[in-house]
Amino acid sequence: METATIIVIFVSSLLVGITAYSVYTAFGPASKNLRDPFEEHED
């Protein structure tokens, strides 16, 4: 394989991994521990 192909595959898989981790953090079991500043603020 060419070097450019390997770099593109690596960068693409890195971006997909970061996206999957952020979705898991936002909606997974750990999301119960996240605080919501809009719910804490009362008018």
UniProtKB/Swiss-Prot annotation:
<protein>
    <recommendedName>
        <fullName>Protein PsbN</fullName>
    </recommendedName>
</protein>
<feature type="transmembrane region" description="Helical">
    <location>
        <begin position="4"/>
        <end position="24"/>
    </location>
</feature>
<comment type="function">
    <text>May play a role in photosystem I and II biogenesis.</text>
</comment>
<keyword id="KW-0472">Membrane</keyword>
<dbReference type="InterPro" id="IPR003398">
    <property type="entry name" value="PSII_PsbN"/>
</dbReference>
<dbReference type="Pfam" id="PF02468">
    <property type="entry name" value="PsbN"/>
</dbReference>
<dbReference type="GO" id="GO:0015979">
    <property type="term" value="P:photosynthesis"/>
</dbReference>
<keyword id="KW-0812">Transmembrane</keyword>
<keyword id="KW-1133">Transmembrane helix</keyword>
<keyword id="KW-0150">Chloroplast</keyword>
<comment type="similarity">
    <text>Belongs to the PsbN family.</text>
</comment>
<keyword id="KW-0793">Thylakoid</keyword>
<keyword id="KW-0934">Plastid</keyword>
<dbReference type="GO" id="GO:0009535">
    <property type="term" value="C:chloroplast thylakoid membrane"/>
</dbReference>
